[in-house]
Amino acid sequence: MSIIYALIAREDTQSGYGENIHVLVEQSLDAVGNFPQITRQEILKKVPKNDRSLYKYKEKYVYHTINEDSFTYLCLTDASFPKRTAMTFLEEIKKSFNEKYSFDERIKAITFKMNDSFGGILGNKMKYYNQNSLDPRLARIKNEAQATLGIMEGNLDSVNERGEKLELLVKS
């Protein structure tokens, strides 16, 4: 369960839709395969304008996308990765990217212009979400189960101590 690959791309608004797309920053974590090429040559051209979408790829992977104002925020995940978590990841990188760069900087950027300045941020966010990828509801249930386990262990320790005291009483 992980985010394998992510990118931020900009469509050249002067040309026709999907004809001239610039990948401004991309990052992959332990990805084996030609995901970057497939994404740039095929997937980016299919992303609908001003929409959120999912694309299954070979039943093992899912592309998650957000397209707003000529920018596409995309990540590729294992099929088992929670969809809500992937979209939260995309919203967070969109927010960080928009805070770091002015609209003018973003709209004038050339291909891979922001790899050096934003690639590390993108990679760190991918690592964070890969380590904390549980659906928020599952994470809450897991925390509650751990708290319950701690209480039960404390109760068992108390019972064991009382058992020893009872044993001493019976012997005397």
Regions found by a protein language model. Give the residues of each.
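Soluble N-terminal interaction domains of secretory/endomembrane membrane proteins
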Residues: 1-161, 167-168
